[in-house]
């Protein structure tokens, strides 16, 4: 049996569609045993972007033997099984898709993704979608906050095609994950960029009796120019792999003030003579600071599975 290297495209019920890296042929992969030993507790051992090694048997069938170490990972918390659940791995960019009006932008969600992206060396881009329906004042205000911090913010519409060219430029020659909550138009945006993605989603939905245009698991799409990963609508995004004392380094706006704090170990919470807390509303955004406090509290009470 040939022992080859593959990339995971998608999977359900421990049956995976995997791409052989040299021939670019699609194989069906399964675990030879009941589980794949990965050395950590998690709900889904394989996600799009994972590189695996396996033995070919039969006609395009593979026994998956090993998962290669991941360069990076994005994950969420699965409450049903009380475990972390990987979403995608080994990505270059993450596009954080939001609606310009409804559903309401969740700045706390954006801040969580930004922290993880920075910590995992993934380039984050904030996308404001559905701008043809108007942009709320709240969204405009947060867009300016993120722009002033140096984050790229794109405004897009699948109806007017605004911003689509810029999105394609980001995708070119890279692997990019689209992250966002349900209803923000994430999958519609992907389908406009690559029509083959829509066809693939429909075929998979029909095969597994899922609703069309509803992403219930991560799926990657390969083209000559890019690799796109569509992900399920996410309510809770995992951050708990980060040591709590390091969180402050991933809030860019703190950098210009932290050196003036009395204590080098200052966490910018209730310490005396803290330059960060003294600058709230004057260089430090209050909503961003509230996100910092929420995430910090979570990290101090992390789950063991996240380490």
UniProtKB/Swiss-Prot annotation:
Known role: One of several proteins that assist in the late maturation steps of the functional core of the 30S ribosomal subunit. Helps release RbfA from mature subunits. May play a role in the assembly of ribosomal proteins into the subunit. Circularly permuted GTPase that catalyzes slow GTP hydrolysis, GTPase activity is stimulated by the 30S ribosomal subunit.
Binding partners and assembly: Monomer. Associates with 30S ribosomal subunit, binds 16S rRNA.
Gene3D superfamilies on file: P-loop containing nucleotide triphosphate hydrolases, Probable gtpase engc, domain 3
Keyword Zinc appears in the UniProt entry: yes
Sequence ranges assigned to domain CP-type G in this UniProt record: 80-237
Localization of this protein: Cytoplasm
EC numbers for this chain: 3.6.1.-
Cofactor(s) required, per the database record: Zn(2+)
Domain of life: Bacteria
PANTHER family according to UniProt: SMALL RIBOSOMAL SUBUNIT BIOGENESIS GTPASE RSGA, SMALL RIBOSOMAL SUBUNIT BIOGENESIS GTPASE RSGA 1, MITOCHONDRIAL-RELATED
GO biological process: ribosomal small subunit biogenesis
Cofactor note: Binds 1 zinc ion per subunit.
CDD domains reported in the protein's UniProt record: YjeQ_EngC
Pfam families: RsgA_GTPase
Catalytic EC class: hydrolase
Chain residues that bind GTP: 129-132, 180-188
Residues where Zn(2+) binds: 261, 266, 268, 274
Keywords recorded for this protein, A-Z: Cytoplasm, GTP-binding, Hydrolase, Metal-binding, Nucleotide-binding, Ribosome biogenesis, RNA-binding, rRNA-binding, Zinc
PROSITE patterns named among the record's database cross-references: ENGC_GTPASE, G_CP
Name the UniProt record assigns to this protein: Small ribosomal subunit biogenesis GTPase RsgA
Gene Ontology terms for molecular function: GTP binding; GTPase activity; metal ion binding; rRNA binding
Main location: cytoplasm
Keyword Zinc: yes
Any one annotated GO CC term: cytoplasm
Family: Belongs to the TRAFAC class YlqF/YawG GTPase family. RsgA subfamily.
